């Protein structure tokens, strides 16, 4: 049986909002598989739709550029928020973004190699590790949005103006859509959610035909919630983003959203334990 660690229980609690004992029991029954535990908890009514994995734990900045008909987002990481505000660190991050904007398609390995000497010199000067973590390009980018340099968004599309696409980019930053349109949600994702909703509906005790209608309604809601055009517009929740775009004669063809440290979990060591280790346990 897989080890059920405290950090695994903590993550399940954060993603489902369920109690500690319920989370531990679900993980034991799922043999430590957190995604299976979430599915089982949803089917049993212990949890609603879970938050996506990807706790933000690393520090750093997101830098955006739009040039020559395309956009680029770059993430550069460091260890502390203090260094994330350092002029030298910010200068290097912006230099990397400028290079990527001038050399479309440069992949992360080549980008890291290009700036390795400068990165190493800055590490030696500041005394803290830093990495150029990722880069992504978007054709037909119309607007970018940075939220405190911690979240970066690019939006591509046709019609409308820069102000319109800037508003859409702000929405993407706030609402975290995963797809552009409800029809873009992959078939396997739809099928996975449908299976969960069928189990939930059948447990209601209602006739099958009613249960099936319930599932169809919930699936429309699900695909709307995870897609940009199906979400309520953050600046005017009375209309969807799709309605907002349609009224302006505009369409979105794609977007990219970066958040500093997505998917990275920084190990937080207990301060007392660290002191004890340094002093040989004679604190």
UniProtKB/Swiss-Prot annotation:
- Top-rank taxon, per record: Bacteria
What taxonomic ancestry is recorded? Bacteria, Pseudomonadati, Pseudomonadota, Gammaproteobacteria, Pasteurellales
Function, please? Associates with the EF-Tu.GDP complex and induces the exchange of GDP to GTP. It remains bound to the aminoacyl-tRNA.EF-Tu.GTP complex up to the GTP hydrolysis stage on the ribosome.
Assigned keywords, A-Z:
Cytoplasm, Elongation factor, Protein biosynthesis
In which broad location class does this protein mainly occur, judging by the first location in its UniProt entry? Answer: cytoplasm
Intrachain S-S bonds: none
Give the protein family. Answer: Belongs to the EF-Ts family.
**Protein encoded by which gene:** tsf
The cross-references to NCBIfam families, in alphabetical order and at most eight, read: tsf
Q: Which InterPro entries match?
A: EF-Ts_dimer_sf, Transl_elong_EFTs/EF1B, Transl_elong_EFTs/EF1B_dimer, Transl_elong_Ts_CS, UBA-like_sf
Q: Where is it localised?
A: Cytoplasm
Pfam families in the record: EF_TS
Q: Which Gene3D superfamilies match?
A: 1.10.286.20, DNA helicase RuvA subunit, C-terminal domain, Elongation factor Ts, dimerisation domain
Renumbered to this chain, region (Involved in Mg(2+) ion dislocation from EF-Tu) spans 80-83
Q: What is this protein called?
A: Elongation factor Ts
* HAMAP family assigned to the protein according to its UniProt record, in alphabetical order: EF_Ts
According to the UniProt entry, its GO molecular function terms are:
translation elongation factor activity
Q: List GO terms (cellular component aspect).
A: cytoplasm
